[in-house]
């Protein structure tokens, strides 16, 4: 069994995820072998199967770790003691920033999610739905209180915003004309403008 950490103290699961993320981004999920992943991580196949069970589990975890981070942050924004407009704007901008910060993970997942088994695909969709429902609840709270317009259904507003977020990997470039925070601010402001009465 591989050492639990490497010379820098990085635990085996994180090494495997980092190696898989890099290789999936460079070569594609379907063209990356388990052998390449374990060699890049400096571990044995036994270590991979101990921590993840399969290459498919690695793919699922690449996306799930970002979604967990985003869910925790959304919950924090949603529960904050602030006006609903500010909470929604903060959450809308944050999901853009965290997606850009993890662009390889998001890109890999959306390109490769069709490789997941129906069971794993369903699990990921349920986790995403939970996130979207919490986000939608902020929109609905603002609509009920009269802060936001009810002219457009909350579901459509949420789909509009997340359509933009999910396609960041197709056009955003770190060396482009906008910083990640500028993109986040623009998209959050677009969302709020769409909701103004």
What are these regions (language model features)?
Residues 26-30, 80-81, 102, 145, ...:
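Short coil/turn segments at alpha/beta junctions that flank glycine-rich nucleotide-binding fingerprints
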Residues 1-11, 15-18, 81:
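N-terminal intrinsically disordered/low-complexity leader segments
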Residues 1-3, 93-101, 132-145, 163-164, ...:
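C-terminal peripheral helix-coil segments that are non-catalytic and often amphipathic
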Residues 100-119, 170:
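Amphipathic alpha-helical segments used for helix-helix packing
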Residues 61, 75-105, 154-161, 184:
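Hydrophobic alpha-helical connector segments
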Residues 55, 62, 66, 70, ...:
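Hydrophobic/aromatic residues within well-ordered alpha-helical segments
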Residues 15, 19-57, 61:
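Helix-turn-helix
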Residues 68-71, 75, 119-145, 154-159, ...:
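Amphipathic alpha-helical packing segments from all-alpha helical-bundle domains
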